[in-house]
From Swiss-Prot:
This is Cytochrome c oxidase subunit 1. It is an enzyme of class 7 (translocase). Mg(2+) binds at residues 367-368. GO terms for biological process: aerobic respiration; oxidative phosphorylation; respiratory electron transport chain. It comes from the Eukaryota. Keywords: Calcium, Copper, Electron transport, Heme, Iron, Magnesium, Membrane, Metal-binding, Mitochondrion, Mitochondrion inner membrane, Respiratory chain, Translocase, Transmembrane, Transmembrane helix, Transport. Cu cation binds at residues 239, 289-290. The chain crosses the membrane at residues 16-36, 55-75, 101-121, 144-164, 182-202, 233-253, 267-287, 304-324, 337-357, 379-399, 415-435, 451-471. Fe(II)-heme a binds at residues 60, 377. Belongs to the heme-copper respiratory oxidase family. Heme a3 binds at residue 375. GO terms for molecular function: cytochrome-c oxidase activity; heme binding; metal ion binding. It catalyses: 4 Fe(II)-[cytochrome c] + O2 + 8 H(+)(in) = 4 Fe(III)-[cytochrome c] + 2 H2O + 4 H(+)(out).
């Protein structure tokens, strides 16, 4: 057992570990979000202290981003699918792959510890000084959170190096870059973004650490520092990070839509690759749109508004190419396809509210209101999460060699769809009416939509529990698929289900008939 799970060098086993870890962290993060909605579900105090409330909000963000979405998308799907799609026997650095995983549990432990010592880190996930300084947040909490981020960051950087090396060096003959599957492209672009952005975050939080403990003044005006410098450094990481969260999802959705449409390739395959490259590049030059309210020059604001809107172009190319891939097909309403439809629709809605927020003048009013919360939860809670659900339902027979009950999956999708929309759609109204983020209480005039929102979160929770039940039922009954349900658009399906522990003992050769 310890040989297989503790010291594993097998990409499939490590991928499975990532899935289990991500699912566990996801349950912790979901519990925190239920606490947030319980607090906001009625006027007056429930938990009481705003510090505790902000600790919950901060932990919810960190856990969902660094310990749920990234481990599942990059660690789980990436590890499982990239070697299979490339025809590679494993990742380029199998032991480093294992180390990448085993840095995450200690990292999560440090994050949880930060909530339990002193008063917790109630800084929001951005950890802005002076709130995160040694005066406003005395004690070890923020320091523990910083070390947690360091560990998670090292884990991601090592993983990124591994994926980039694997894709450069371990492709089978015949898989040229232009014929490489879109999911592999999405993962390698994600890896480059991680490699370039995480060191900047590491620098920023290390400077914060020395400001707190070693008497430096990087972010303290009293010593000639500037807290705005921290914001620039953080968001130079933070904005690429949101594209890191969604890009692997783009790759998965491309595969699912292509395969379920019965097409042999995605519409505009090369355009899709260039669109992802453009999104990755542009993601680095728009960071200050998170800072429209800190007092930048008007020409700076004009630039960041324009650059942010340009990102909508490659994103639009992807949306319309997915629709074009669907064009002319007999639509199948399989569970994976339902998730993909939900993704395309809701991600588009989230993208549109993003274009609204890109206008610096409008953002002055909407900044730090629930409109922003609604925007990023539409692209994360219904973009990233729907992509994860789509990918899991689609590749579940490959991962386990079992099938889930499709009728139940469709019911579960419907419940989840209603739940997330009921949770986050009303938040647009709250934001437009001026309800601010990160407060545990609110004027009674905001009550109705907050009650609706909290009701939606309960429905979503039920949907997630139902999904866990469906997986459990599938594993108990052990229904095996007789054969893959559709013609494959990618080579990972040309295996036994699940694949043998060591696939591609002999290098596959891909010809033009592929």
């Amino acid at each position: 057992m310890s040989r297989q799970w503790l010291f594993s060098t097998n990409h499939k086993d490590i991928g499975t570990l990532y899935f289990i870890f991500g699912a566990w962290a996801g349950m912790v993060g979901t519990s925190l979000s239920i606490l947030i909605r319980a607090e906001l579900g009625h006027p007056g105090a429930f938990i009481g202290d705003d510090q505790i409330y902000n600790v919950i909000v901060t932990a919810h963000a960190f856990i969902m981003i660094f310990f749920m979405v990234m481990p599942i998308m990059i660690g789980g799907f990436g590890n499982w699918l990239v070697p299979l799609m490339l025809g590679a026997p494993d990742m380029a650095f199998p032991r480093m792959n294992n180390m990448s995983f085993w840095m995450l549990p200690p990292s999560l432990t440090l994050l949880i510890s930060s909530s339990m010592v002193e008063n917790g880190a109630g800084t929001g996930w951005t950890v802005y000084p002076p709130l995160s300084s040694g005066i406003a947040h005395a004690g070890a909490s923020v320091d523990l959170a910083i070390f947690s981020l360091h560990l998670a960051g090292i884990s991601s950087i090592l993983g990124a190096v591994n994926f980039i090396t694997t894709v450069i060096n371990m492709r089978s003959p015949g898989i040229t870059l232009d014929r490489m599957p879109l999911f592999v492209w999405s993962v390698v672009i994600t890896a480059v973004l991680l490699l370039l952005s995480l060191p900047v975050l590491a620098g920023a939080i290390t400077m914060l650490l020395t400001d707190r403990n070693l008497n430096t003044s990087f972010f303290d005006p009293a010593g000639g520092g500037d807290p705005i410098l921290y914001q620039h450094l953080f968001w130079f990481f933070g904005h690429p990070e949101v594209y890191i969260l969604i890009l692997p999802g783009f790759g998965m959705i491309s595969h699912i839509i292509t395969q379920e449409s019965g097409k042999k390739e995605t519409f505009g395959n090369l355009g899709m690759i260039y669109a992802m490259l453009a999104i990755g590049l542009l993601g680095f030059i728009v960071w200050a749109h998170h800072m429209f309210t800190v007092g930048m020059d008007v020409d700076t604001r004009a630039y960041f508004t324009s650059a942010t809107m340009i990102i909508a172009v490659p994103t639009g190319i992807k949306i319309f190419s997915w629709l074009a891939t669907l064009h002319g097909t007999q639509l199948t309403y399989s569970p994976a396809m339902l998730w993909a439809f939900g993704f395309v629709f809701l991600f588009t809605v989230g993208g549109l509210t993003g274009v609204v927020l890109a206008n610096s003048s409008i953002d002055i009013v909407l900044h730090d209101t629930y409109y922003v919360v609604a925007h990023f939860h539409y692209v994360l809670s219904m973009g990233a999460v729907f992509a994860i659900m789509a990918g899991f339902v689609h590749w579940y027979p490959l991962l386990t060699g079992l099938t889930m009950n499709p009728t139940w999956l469709k019911i579960q999708f419907s419940i989840m769809f209603v739940g997330v929309n009921l949770t986050f759609f009303p938040q647009h109204f709250l934001g437009l009416a001026g309800m601010p983020r990160r407060y545990s209480d609110f004027p009674d005039s905001y009550l109705t939509w907050n009650v609706v929102s909290s009701l939606g979160s309960t429905i979503s929770l039920f949907a997630i529990l139902y999904f866990l039940f469906i997986i459990w039922e599938s594993m108990i009954t052990q229904r095996t698929p007789a054969f893959p349900m559709q013609l494959s658009s990618s080579i990972e399906w040309y295996h036994t289900l699940p694949p043998a522990e060591h696939t591609y003992a002999e290098l596959p050769l891909l010809t033009n008939n592929f």
